[in-house]
Amino acid sequence: FVNNNIIDKNKLKQIIEKEKDLDIYLKEENNEIELNMYLLDICPEYYVLNNQKHINRDFKKITFVNDDYEYSATMLDKNELKYSLSINYGNNLFEGGSGTGKTTIMLSRAIKLARVYPQHRFIVFVSSKKLCNQLKEELEILYKDNNNLEIHTLSSFLFKLAKKFDLIADYRMFKQDYEKYLNNLIKQARNVIKNKNMFKGIFIDEAESFKVEEIEFISEFLYKTKNILDIYYCNALNITNDLNIFKSRDDIKVNQKIDLDINYRQDKNLIEFINRFCQNSNDYIKTLRPMIKNDIYVPTKSIYNQGQDPEIIKVIDLEEQIESILWEIDFLRNKKGLDYSDIAIVYPYNKKKLKNGKTIYFQYILRKALEEAKIPYMVAEDEITNITKKVGITISNIYGIKNLEYKAVIFCELEMLYNQTIGDTKQDYQINDFVGDLNKIYLAINASTSYLKIITTFNEDSSEIIKILIKSS
């Protein structure tokens, strides 16, 4: 293919000097599949794997087999490509809503630099084991000769340092008090590892889930000069206990800020609904705290067709909610032609203790209902990623669904969220906790690419969250 289709400088010289005829290269159209496979081989950083949407229409989607598993690859959009083609030294902040390609751009830039500078080391940090697993799998396919690009969570990186530098680390204690022992390892690392300048480039995805102190610690491992620190951020996706809407992150100094607003994930109608949710949420927060100048939720722009309007379905009780879930599954399968693997059922928590002392085990109730209906399902554990071959419907709490996307999401049992209303609007912590639950809503509704069904027993009078959702529909 290269010999017949690529003109290098030597062949160009022969053509100019008329030693070769240009017509031999123009005798027929290029085979687009062969051309795409060639580009995937020589510049894999410009491709995204198993994307549900076909982004760049100038290049066909290609499929290939790796280790007995079939993958698809599509070329990045031209707006994504420009951030991979031009990379500046210094601290770069990429900020954008869910679906704007932050992780895709991050991995593309990381692979690009690692291939350009094979003598230097680079590292990617993510907040979840799930995304870490996915990016490692993508890296194995896209960067086959990799020996200088690592992917870690902060804890896995610290465990690696502990093993290498004989730090005191009791792995069992992490399960008892994660924060305490993570901070202990960070202190040890600072004291023991004097020369921490290990990496030419560091990439922090999901930076909203990292503390400022953790980002500062990570950045200490950069070279002193000619380094690259990329930070990818969306405040609305912060569902950690460290969320503080009253605290600015301006103390993280950046040389360049890039705002991402093109939504590569979702259909137009769904994006418009989410944009209204963003606007209504921002307005509500600012009526309570006008001093909050920056929007927590940012709108995105659609590049796809209309799609389906999201639905909010009101039911009477838990039993009717389960019946509605089963009905929606049947509708999506038989009327919309979706496979079970295209559908996710999302709920806030696996279980919740009620005020009367009883505990509702929602995941157990849901699993039992699916089994009785003979509907195959799988639970969204850390090993389940966007690349994983799925068997059946995915069921997940709000933490398991992060980093996953499906054609259809059935979001139910919103009643489990603790902050349906703000009891005392004078209390900052109550407003902060309410925003934390709004963030959980934002995360769940953004897991869908086309169909969104929200099922609830609450109405506008009993829940400010439901009021915002209904106002957005």
Predicted feature descriptions by range:
Residues E19, D23, Y46, N50, ...:
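Short, flexible helical or helix-coil boundary motifs
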Residues N51-L76, E95:
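Conserved adenine-nucleotide phosphate-binding loops and their immediately adjacent elements
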Residues V65, I87-Y89:
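A mid-sequence, solvent-exposed acidic-amphipathic segment
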Residues S72-A73, K78, K82, Y89-D145, ...:
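Conserved helicase motor core of SF1/SF2 NTP-dependent helicases
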Residues F165-F221, T394-Y399:
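Conserved RecA-like ASCE ATPase "motif II neighborhood" in helicase/translocase motors
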Residues F1-H54:
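Accessory nucleic-acid engagement/destabilization modules that flank
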